[in-house]
Amino acid sequence: MRAFLLASLASLPAVNVYAHPTHNSRGLTRRAVDLDAFRPKVPTSYTNATAVQADPEIPTLARRADPEQVASELVAKILPDAQFRLVSDHYVGTNGVAHFYYKQTVHGLDVDSGDFNVNIGKDGNVFSFGNSFYKGKLPAAPTLKRDTEAAANALRSAVNVLSLPMSAESATAVPKEGSDAFTITQTSGAVKEPEARLVYVQDASGNLKLAWRVETDIQSNWLLTYVDAEDGSQVHAVVDYAAEATYEVYPWGISDPTEGERVVLTDPFDRQASEFGWHSDGTTEFNTTRGNNGLAHTNWENLSSGYLNFPRPSSADLKFEYPYSLEETDYKAYANASITQLYYTSNAYHDLLHTLGFNERAGNFEINNNGAGGRGGDLVYLNTQDGGGVNNANFLTPPDGQPPRMRMFIWTKTSPSRDSSFDAGVVIHEYTHGLSSRLTGGPANAGCLSSIESGGMGEGWSDFYATAIRLKPADTRATDYPMGAWIEGDSRGIRNFLYSTSMETNPQVYTNVDQYIRVHPIGNIWASMLYEVLWNLIDKHGKNDAAKPDFDANGVPTDGKYLTMKLVLDGMALQPCNPTFVSARDAIIDADKALTGGSNACEIWRGFAKRGLGAGARYDPTTRTDSFELPEGVC
């Protein structure tokens, strides 16, 4: 990922370029420009369900048959002077909560950092809401026009300031039909032609600035760069979309080759989640590692287009069974086994997440949504043995309807080197970046984990799901887990601390976030809190070791492991754009209230309070406040 810091397993992710975990300085790849320095700094708030019920004004909103009207009236009531528009990606989650997303507008232009999400409960009333609308003095109406030369110059500024590996000297902007954006032609080095449009964005001082939002997909990074529209040289912020018959594979639950043997699985797909199976998109049957959810292949040359022509196995009878040896020194010799493993793990995880609520309406990854809502056309491009780097992996998540990319690299920390596609924890970590990016702020807004704290939580959610899924039947709350131990060749893994409920093994608390300016160590703290919640709920409800959950008549997972995974997922959909630890905690508590009536509040609060995120915890970007107290009467 060259001229700047890349988000990846082993490097420190830039705004939404995400990757596998990394242990501080080990495996760090640096660029000339640090994208973390350009992360947006936008204040956000989350009003949880308890606060909504206590507010005498909010319940006065008339209950109506149309929840969209209730949501719109709330936004107008909270911010009566604001202009806004409803984004088209609203949906009803599997817990019955409807999610509506609004974008602030000023002088007819979007405020890209101004988002308002409203959650409407099953009873038709406001459940909770999040808000990052700009509340300061509005600038005068712009005199600048949507000028083609200015749009092209904005791209040149982005290339120069960020040292992007592309050429824009001859760039020419052309109005995009049916849109107020410009397509910029006559460039080289980008996967697709860049685009630019005028928007407003908050600068580092909290002022609203007119800017060109320049979108560039340069393979390793997919960037939104906000270039000041007045002087054309200052970059205010950067968002990166970059923090799968029969298959002979390491089966679900086997995290890496040290934990078990490869087996041959027959038709392991879940028909409810993948109604076409794993080798059809509903119109065409495929005899290769291609289907509705993903397209898997090698990418040794680090190419950025032509994915359909990349090397992948083909089998007329759909028998994807290929040899693999840990002793093999030439990783290309087992490429087909690697492709098959990545295709299997990714599809299996797609199906599990669909069962838990990450479905078509919520913005999951499918070519054909089959009338189930959301936008299709976005299966995952699954690159194994990717030639774009080593000792790393990443997942690039654009908005719903555009296909994301997973790039799995070879790791050279051992001899022979190791293929990260055989480490299920790494694959799940990467795919979970797509989950958290699509759910937070709505499927059409992939830039809602762009602050340093929310980006860190993105890493934490990815570690959490990778860890929860690999729990073994004999595990107890005394069981500790590393992240990336096999691929790194180090039993400590690549995180600062093991995931453990022991405060001696892992002493991290909320205020430790103050000492970090990178997302992976922040994510280690967030995932440590979720690990506490996980074991509290397992101790209460037991642990289902099957590959998918059982649900009661109300759609609640019957065991603690899958219940925690469900609540964390639902919390992502409730929380505001760019959440903090505090607002994300509140969203998980609200998710339990929506799903179970709040029957697990005590266990959830105990898990967070143990590590300093109790009732009195306070967020400040430089000086956070610990609290180990529980709310009165919660237990």
From Swiss-Prot:
Q: Does the keyword Cell membrane apply?
A: no
> What's the record's note on cofactor binding?
Binds 1 zinc ion per subunit.
Q: Where is the signal peptide?
A: 1-19
Residues annotated as glycosylated: 287, 302, 336
Keyword Hydrolase appears in the UniProt entry: yes
The catalytic residues are 430
In its UniProt record, a GO molecular function of this protein is: metalloendopeptidase activity
Pfam families reported for this sequence: FTP (PF07504), Peptidase_M36 (PF02128)
Q: What is its EC number?
A: 3.4.24.-
Name this polypeptide is given:
Extracellular metalloproteinase MEP
